[in-house]
Amino acid sequence: MTQLSLKKIYSGKVRDLYEIDDKRMLMVATDRLSAFDVILDDPIDRKGEILTQISNFWFKKLAHIMPNHFTGETVYDVLPQAEADLVKDRAVVCKRLTPIKIESIVRGYLTGSGLKDYKATGTICGLKLPEGLVEASKLPEPIFTPSSKAKVGDHDINISYEECEQLIGVELAKQVREKAISLYKEAAEYALTKGIIICDTKFEFGLDENGVLTLMDEVLTPDSSRFWSVETYQEGTNPPSFDKQFVRDWLEKSGWNKQAPAPKVPADVIQKTVDKYKEVLDLLTK
């Protein structure tokens, strides 16, 4: 990644944050790829640009549901032109918000950790589901299944709605659940018209200086969501997804112990992953 004249205040698995002032920051999506909570050595070319374009598309499309982290400024308002030219497709000027301390996950279909919980208990995060559901079953209604935010390198833990209320308060939990489900429903309905099923997704929320709940970070990207193709979807199977699954599958078969450092991923696996991210962008925005 290029060096910027702003002060870097945080480096996450994918995004770097730079301080502009006490109210604004610059969020830059890198080409880093993480799998199994380990950052891989090989970046995915243009991934940061594609993720930013997908996120920006959704932020604008869903802006009528709730406020988001945009300030309305561009990178050219806060960086010298030469630096702005380098990051213009992968950076956004954002409000500095106080993050809500939970991961806000909405599921419309049964798979992943939700399927494991359901098989064991008939519930997900304490929510009772109908009997007889199988892998990739569509749920009667989308459900809000929060998890606790883990430190970098640890795994998030699914929590019940009651635990969510204890963590962030009854009123805020209600607001977060309602907004998360509204965002998911509208996005899922739109994506379906483009041949994409949004199986599940994770939203990030924060509070602004006036305590207003605000959508932040990234929205409905292949990094934060599971996207399936309508064409290959079949209940009872594990449908292929538009994301880093190629890389995860290759790593699973490589015999790697899932501890850093990760093995070098072959170029063709990296390329297939880029193609999948690009396909999502094209399908959603054209």
UniProtKB/Swiss-Prot annotation:
SUPFAM superfamilies: SAICAR synthase-like. It catalyses: 5-amino-1-(5-phospho-D-ribosyl)imidazole-4-carboxylate + L-aspartate + ATP = (2S)-2-[5-amino-1-(5-phospho-beta-D-ribosyl)imidazole-4-carboxamido]succinate + ADP + phosphate + 2 H(+). The keyword ATP-binding applies. InterPro entries: SAICAR_synt/ADE2_N, SAICAR_synth, SAICAR_synthetase_CS. Pfam families: SAICAR_synt. CDD domains: SAICAR_synt_Sc. Its EC number is 6.3.2.6. GO terms for biological process: 'de novo' IMP biosynthetic process. GO terms for molecular function: ATP binding; phosphoribosylaminoimidazolesuccinocarboxamide synthase activity. HAMAP family: SAICAR_synth. This is Phosphoribosylaminoimidazole-succinocarboxamide synthase. It comes from Histophilus somni (strain 2336) (Haemophilus somnus). The gene is purC.
